[in-house]
Amino acid sequence: MSDKILNVEGDEGQSIPLIIDSPHSGTEYPLDFNHQAELSKLRQAEDTHVNELYEYVSSIGGVFIEAKFPRSYIDPNRSETDFIFEDLNEKNNSISEIKFNPTIKSELGIGLVWIKIPPNGEPMYKDKITLKQLMDRVNIYHRPYHKILKHTLNETYKNYGKFYHVNAHSMQNQATAMSDQSQGTIRPDFVIGDREGTSCHRKFTDLIVDFLRGLNYSVDINYPYKGMELVKAYSDPLQNKNSVQIEAVSYTHLTLPTILLV
């Protein structure tokens, strides 16, 4: 399955309960984005080529899901409520069907819709977006992505009595001004997030960590990334519904010149 929103591979020939999704590697920028960022800066928000790292999973019987749209336009790894109402060009909060409940991600300008340009946090828009523009993005992009992922996880659980869901990302090797870490903080090669053991059975987390450390990569668990909405929303390790987030530093699979050339 493939459309303008996402691409799904392996769903028809699935033979193992493994699903990998890449929500932040999309590069098809909608015409109504109306940002004021240089594309080279805007693309720093992408998890560039992460989709190419994991798309093999369909060849071994798993399912691979990737977003085609950029996370700076709307981020499927955020709750629909993760936005600050005052960042909209609206005055009356009661007209919104969403009751906003922003997290620190929105405070950093990287919530449901990014309002800051990476890496230094300049304003993304000349004028604030409207509630209608926000809801169009939610309805056309965010909800369909979640619908497909949820359906795939549910079908896998129905067929196998369990699922192992890997939410795949990349990160810069140093924290930027838009991070909740101190700018310049050096990160490990990988961060594995299981929301402090609430989204995934720890044996699955340990399996991934031990494998990566066996390859001499540095690996941290749950810091600075413990997993956001896509790991949280559909997991329940007590019911064998396991979701884990993998953050890989970009230099483990690409270099800056690669980003600039694509």
Name each model feature, range by range.
Residues E38-S40, K126-Y141, F190-S199:
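Short histidine-centered catalytic/ligand-binding loop motif
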Residues T252-T258:
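Conserved small/polar residues in nucleotide/adenosyl-binding loops
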Residues P144-Y251:
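Catalytic cores of processing enzymes, dominated by hydrolases/peptidases
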Residues I16-P23, G111-Y125, K241-A248:
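Short coil-to-beta-strand
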Residues S2-I104, M124, K128-L131:
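Active-site loop/lid in soluble adenylation, ligation, and acyl-transfer enzymes
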Residues S106-L153:
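Internal, conserved structured core segments that host functional sites
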Residues I19, T27-E28, F69, S79-K116, ...:
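Active-site microenvironments of hydrolase-like enzyme catalytic domains
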